[in-house]
Design a protein with these regions (language model features):
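GH16 jelly-roll
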Residues: 2-244
Length: 244
C-alpha cells in the first residue's frame, strides 16, 4: 500500500498479488531470464548472462571493465520478456544499488513490440554516482513526437547500503512512482495531451519487466566512469512483486 501526499490524485489500489518473484534460490525465478546483447547502441555496455549470479539471497548483476565486441564494459540484464507482461497494476522491485560514477542502474518496464505505439516506464534509475537521488520517467518512442517525462526524489538513506522498494503504479491515464511505499510523483494522460504528447501506455500491449546495470558513455546522461569508480560493481535484486 502506498502513502499519497497532499496534492496527489488517488491511485488505484491493486490488491491481487499475481506475481511474487523471490531471487533467493540457485537459479533465476521461473519467468526470468538473463540476456546477451547491447542496449540498441546506447551505453558502453555489452550484457552477458555470465554477469548474473545467484547469491542465495539475491540476483547479483555485476559490471566489469573488460572489453567485449567493441564495448569496454560487460554487465548483467534480466527480464520477463516472452514470459510475463502486464498492462495495469503495481510493480515493486526490492533492490540494492551500486555506488560509483558512470554506473547506470535501471528497473523498468518495456513493450515487446518496438513499432507503433511504443512506450517505456522507468521505475528507477540511479546515476551520477549519487545513491540518494532516484529518477522515474516515461518515454514515448513512437508514434512521433518522441518525448520523455522525468521525475525524481531524494532518499534519506544511501541506496547502496541496503535494500529498498522501488515502485510504480500504472493505471488507465496515470502513472505514479514511489520509494519504500511513499509516492513522490505522478504524471497523467491529460498532462501529456495538453502538451501535445502521445500516450502509448493505455494501448493494451502490455509491458514486461527488466532489471539491468549499465555503464554509461562520456556523452550520455550521467557520464562515464572515472578513476574513483570501483569494478566489479554490483546491483542486487531480492524480489519483484506485481499486483493487479
Amino acid at each position: 500500500m502506498l502513502t499519497l501526499s497532499h496534492g496527489f490524485a488517488r491511485a488505484v489500489r491493486y490488491r491481487e498479488l499475481v506475481k511474487d518473484y523471490e531471487f533467493t534460490g540457485s537459479r533465476l525465478p521461473a519467468g526470468w531470464s538473463a540476456s546477451a546483447g547491447d542496449s540498441h547502441g546506447f551505453q558502453a555496455t555489452m550484457f552477458q548472462p555470465s554477469r548474473v549470479r545467484m547469491t542465495g539471497s539475491s540476483a547479483a548483476l555485476s559490471a566489469i571493465h573488460e572489453p567485449l565486441w567493441g564495448y569496454p564494459y560487460q554487465s548483467g540484464w534480466i527480464s520477463t520478456e516472452g514470459a510475463f507482461s502486464m498492462s495495469y497494476g503495481m510493480v515493486d522491485f526490492r533492490a540494492k544499488m551500486p555506488a560509483g560514477q558512470g554506473l547506470w542502474s535501471g528497473l523498468w518496464l518495456d513493450q515487446p513490440d518496438h513499432s507503433n505505439p511504443w512506450g517505456e516506464i522507468d521505475v528507477q534509475e540511479m546515476l551520477l554516482g549519487d545513491t540518494h537521488t532516484v529518477y522515474g520517467s516515461l518515454h514515448n518512442w513512437s508514434p512521433s513526437p518522441e518525448w520523455s517525462e522525468l521525475q525524481s526524489t531524494t532518499m534519506t538513506a544511501d541506496a547502496s547500503q541496503g535494500f529498498h522498494d522501488y515502485q510504480v503504479i500504472s493505471q488507465p491515464g496515470m502513472i505514479t512512482w514511489a520509494v519504500d511505499g511513499v509516492a513522490y510523483a505522478q504524471y497523467t494522460k491529460a498532462q501529456a495531451v495538453a502538451a501535445g504528447q502521445p500516450w502509448p501506455f493505455d494501448d493494451g500491449t502490455g509491458f514486461f519487466l527488466i532489471a539491468d546495470l549499465a555503464v554509461a558513455r562520456a556523452s550520455e546522461w550521467g557520464g562515464a566512469p572515472n578513476s574513483s569508480t570501483a569494478f566489479p560493481a554490483t546491483m542486487e535484486i531480492r524480489s519483484v512483486k506485481v499486483w493487479e
